[in-house]
A protein has these predicted regions:
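A short helix-loop-beta-strand connector motif used in the catalytic cores of GNAT acetyltransferases and
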Residues: 31-47
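Short, conserved alpha-helical segments within structured domains
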Residues: 18-22, 44, 116
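Conserved GNAT-fold acetyl-CoA-binding loop/helix
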Residues: 7-32
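Acyl-donor (CoA/ACP) binding surface of acyl/acetyltransferases
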Residues: 1-9, 45, 49-164
Length: 164
């Protein structure tokens, strides 16, 4: 099993090697991201913060929006291993799905999950996502090849789970 994603090991969503960034560069990137979101309504980026101390613990994104088909993809990541398995991901996923299905009126949501991410697989399965595609050996991490799994959830499947 590969080393977990953290601020020191690099993002699980990118193939690029992590590079240290100054506070000024981080601020500049997020200002650009905010401007891009204003200009392009095909993605929404969210920061996940812990309520108790407002600490930044992760990020989430709805992207690849196909308005004509009602499809979108999502990403969700909790950075530090010490912040995982505390319910932050479930809370964020609940809000993301509500936003995608209720606010954006999407028909389906797709998530791309590396096979080594057992926590994410369990979380998305719990929320009713179904594995639809397995891209064999599509990822390389820690000198090993891993499958990339494509999971999907339809609006009516979500509505059945979301209603009491």
């Amino acid at each position: 099993r590969p080393a977990p994603f953290s601020s020191t090991t690099g993002a699980a969503f990118t193939a690029r090697r992590p590079t240290p960034m100054s506070a000024a560069i981080v601020k500049k990137r997020y200002e650009k991201l905010e401007k891009d979101m204003e200009d392009d309504k095909n993605f929404y980026h969210f920061m996940i913060r812990a309520r108790e101390d407002d600490r930044l613990i992760g990020k989430a994104m709805i992207h690849r929006i196909e308005w004509s088909n009602g499809n979108c993809a999502m990403r969700l990541g909790i950075g530090a291993e010490s912040d995982r398995r505390k319910g932050f991901g479930a809370q964020a996923l609940t809000m993301l799905l509500r936003f995608a299905f209720s606010e954006l009126n999407m028909f389906r949501v797709t998530a791309y999950i590396p096979e080594y991410n057992e926590g994410a697989l369990a979380l998305f399965r719990k929320f009713g996502f179904v594995e639809e595609v397995r891209r064999r050996q599509a990822l390389e991490r820690d000198a090993r090849r891993w499958d990339l799994l494509v999971w999907g959830l339809l609006k009516d499947e979500w509505a059945k789970q979301a209603s009491p």
